[in-house]
């Protein structure tokens, strides 16, 4: 979405950030290949909770001074849906969550978000934190020439320990387990048989 805004002339620069092990650079290179201008990799080898991620991002935001920060609404590993909200609180910025459509204005951003009752339109002043829903856009595929160009774009690496942030976990994970296996279903020949089985 940031790249689309840049292509429309409303945004000057797109910076892609990833926090994690060395393999996190792959995500940044993909972002550079589809149009981001530069990347920042904050290297940390241990698991970081959403609050720790938000603290790291706050440091980067204070250095880069963007007008907007786009994040996914939740991570695929822990599904927490907390980082964007925590970042907005730490920065004391307005936030727009679960965004499925964006309209950037002069000093504000209007977003559409999906809620239980339908679609809600919200406008927040800039600078702002925006968390994005999957419906916001279709992922782009990078062409081979753009993949090659991405290798020449700047990718800064920062060690998380240099930021002076406490990223120690506040939550103790006791265990993770798969859900119990379901019993096999019963096939029925027709609706009448199904009704009988449901009655009994």
Regions found by a protein language model. Give the residues of each.
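N-terminal glycine-rich FAD/FM-binding segment characteristic of electron-transfer flavoproteins
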Residues: 1-200
């Amino acid at each position: 979405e940031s790249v689309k805004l840049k292509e429309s002339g409303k945004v000057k620069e797109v910076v892609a950030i990833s926090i994690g092990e060395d393999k996190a650079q792959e995500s940044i290179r993909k972002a550079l290949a589809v149009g981001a201008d530069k990347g920042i990799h904050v290297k940390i080898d241990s698991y970081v909770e959403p609050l720790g991620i938000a603290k790291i991002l706050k440091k980067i935001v204070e250095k880069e001074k963007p007008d907007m920060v786009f994040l996914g609404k939740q991570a695929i590993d822990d599904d927490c849906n907390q980082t964007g909200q925590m970042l907005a609180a730490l920065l004391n910025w307005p936030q727009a969550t679960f965004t499925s459509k964006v309209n950037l204005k002069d000093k504000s951003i209007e977003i559409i978000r999906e809620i239980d009752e339908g679609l809600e339109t919200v406008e927040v002043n800039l600078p702002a934190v925006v968390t994005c829903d999957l419906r916001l856009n279709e992922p782009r595929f990078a062409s081979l020439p753009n993949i090659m160009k991405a290798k020449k774009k700047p990718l800064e690496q920062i060690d998380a320990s240099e930021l002076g942030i406490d990223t120690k976990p506040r939550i103790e994970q006791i265990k993770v387990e798969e859900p119990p296996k379901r019993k096999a279903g019963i096939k029925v020949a027709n609706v009448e048989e199904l009704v009988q089985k449901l009655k009994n």
